[in-house]
């Protein structure tokens, strides 16, 4: 079932985590709901503690106060600042909202369809006392992707004849009409706090590690996955520790099955994060993540290495073996506020002495409307060496991937990238900037473009470098702050070695997740 774990396999783990946290944690007050992933709609990001660990809990998010203007009428608050349905009763808070993304371009596909997105769904959130919160979302999606994305969506599924394509950020998909894609999406979580400063989550969602637009370790680009997490605060909130135990899937099916549609080949994914807020301006964090073997072609599904169940930083060293059966990556992240509005950040990802990725960035927040809204500009440089995440041919089921998506950067490895991202706000009007400039390995051995994560080590051959440019800029109007409902007009332009694709688009959407079409 989506979002659920088999109780038999994990009940002992849950009990251990519960008592472990009760014994070791010092307590501070914590809220329980996650802030939505949206790089362009996180106000005062520079003021958030432990900013490398995402999703943010409401404790650290500077939320928009929908009641700060007492002279605003009820209907205006409902239209512009509140959820469609809002229930407040003692310690209970419930909200319901429609979610959608209606995007259309005047340009047509080769079959005569307009490039478009047709996404419809809903969101329900709830706080039931201070100890229990939940959120659930459901979407139906039809896409007519730009040509470069459509080709990649089909290529990623070509090795499994029961799957037509992938939908980016969603997972497996079916063909829709001649050249469209249809996919469903359901996610959600339940948060429980047995004591102050301790939060457990059981859900179907995603995570992110880092301060930049990109992450070289773990990104929300990947589709939702089943997970169980624990989050603990020490020393008056200066230290934050989080561990996550997840179940991922390869985009290939188990060969022998008694059902018409066999189960996808599984793998287990565990990651530990430790963040230290040394001062209000200085933060350091560590990351340890491993894709554990959970399937053997000869014997079928198997139990992952015991260290998968340990919620302790450093325990994944125990999983390293001579056969590279488990794929481990380590990382460090740091950030420093030069001023209240300007932040420097770095990230390093390490697999071995000759496989080290690096990120350097700067983010500046400012206002052009007397602090009514916050604008920002983000400049970052990302470098990932060739075959950074690749595994050998004997361990293809332990790739750093989930449902045909890279776990970290959408371009995989073998590139250097400059990314310029930002948003200029004036009241509810905005100008959004999203441009990347990349030098990336040109594939050899007839391999697809930017596919190194899914290619075994011995087949990766970088014969030359290609120049990739993605330009995605828009202007628009923010309608509702609770759902980030907006209308925008913009363009998506992509150049690969001087060959351009250009798309004009009109969009009416609720912006609660990142798209990552710049690949």
Short names for language-model regions:
Residues 32-283, 290, 294, 360-383, ...:
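Outer-membrane beta-barrel channel domains
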